[in-house]
Amino acid sequence: MKTVLIGVGQAGGKLASALQSFDRQTGFGAVLDAVAVNTAKADLQSLPVETVLIGQDRVNGHGVGGDNELGAAVMESDQTEVMSALDGRVTAEAESIFVVAGLGGGSGSGGAPVLAKALAGVYDVPVYVLGILPGADEGALYQVNAGRSLKTVAREADAVLLVDNDAFRSAGESMSEGYDAINEAIARRVGLLLAAGEATEGVGESVVDTSEVINTLRSGGIAALGYASAEASPNAEDNINAVMSTTRRAVLTGTSLPDASDADAALVVIAGEPDTIPRKGVERARRWVEDETGSMQVRGGDFPLESGRLASLVLLGGVERSERVESFMERAREAIDKAETEPREDPKGMWHSDDLDDLL
């Protein structure tokens, strides 16, 4: 899937940069371009992508201090500047646009829904949001921001591919080390998904293409992405169990949103050398995902890739009923209840409701 990435806020800019870097290192060619947008000048300076500083008349390059209503207002007033930066970048070759944002910070949580809506009104391709949930220990402000942003962005984007920070954090890591590891892990997963049907080595029996990714996300709402890999045997028949076990791990323990196996649709992609991918294994994995998700809309296919390993990539669409999403929204509601002041109303009405019930 050919795409253009737009990172919003500090976390969004870093992850968009990591995705572009992964795509270039692998030679997939799925990421056509990447742009980072932020209200904090310092957070843009080290990024290896085109950058756009917004809100200079309001915050003078110092960021919005976690205020997502200010982040939304700044994006609303400066969106023309952002859209101008995309001229010549979102070409006819683009099959999608990904807005990448941390949903806990002010610029990302406030700006991403505004930008997604603006992009959808201009471009005739799906606009997805790759959103990062804050960890449970990241403070009440981040929980409130993310809860409101998730509810709003799910309405404005064609789908929200959600990443839970807590699913990737390892014990003993510093905060910066943890975020770097999360970015690398997500870049690998999303990079492989975007590359499906693009830069392939050899010819698979049933190669996944962009339309299958789009159809899996067509129902909208929240999506999750699972991944697992294992050593491959040279003989395809010997890899049936490997395909099954990696698919189970991808769904049960390797998703970007844990406990999200109840889905409206799914796509199972088995990546590896074409001669090592067992057709029976792919079909069995697809049927297992059908049973696990309760969905009859489960697609499956190959991603021919020069590698000594087999990987299972499972895209789950329509997972907003998952336990993890429900527990996060409850956490956000509790944070709102503890807030000492009522949030201000944003001038454009994007943040019209403090009620976090009924996500969609």
UniProtKB/Swiss-Prot annotation:
Q: What SMART domains does the annotation carry?
A: Tubulin
According to the record, the signal peptide region is none
Null mutant phenotype reads: Does not affect motility. No differences in growth rate or cell size.
User: Which residues are recorded as binding GTP?
Assistant: 10-14, 65-66, 106-108, 138, 165, 183
State the InterPro entries in the record: CetZ (IPR032907), CetZ_C (IPR048737), FtsZ/CetZ (IPR045061), Tubulin/FtsZ-like_C (IPR037103), Tubulin/FtsZ_GTPase_sf (IPR036525), Tubulin_FtsZ_GTPase (IPR003008)
Where mainly found? cytoplasm
Q: Name one Pfam family in it.
A: Tubulin
According to the UniProt record, one GO cellular component term is: cell division site
Where in or outside the cell is it found?
A: Cytoplasm
Residue spans of biased composition, Basic and acidic residues class: 334-354
A single GO molecular function term of this UniProt record: GTP binding
Q: Which UniProt keywords apply?
A: Cell shape, Cytoplasm, GTP-binding, Nucleotide-binding
| Superkingdom per UniProt | Archaea
Q: Which GO terms describe its biological process?
A: cell division; regulation of cell shape
Positions of the UniProt region annotated as Disordered: 334-360
Free-text function comment from the UniProt entry: Involved in cell shape control.
According to its UniProt record, which protein family does this protein belong to? Belongs to the CetZ family.
Would you tell me the protein name for this molecule? Tubulin-like protein CetZ2
Species whose genome carries this gene: Haloferax volcanii (strain ATCC 29605 / DSM 3757 / JCM 8879 / NBRC 14742 / NCIMB 2012 / VKM B-1768 / DS2)
Q: Which gene encodes it?
A: cetZ2
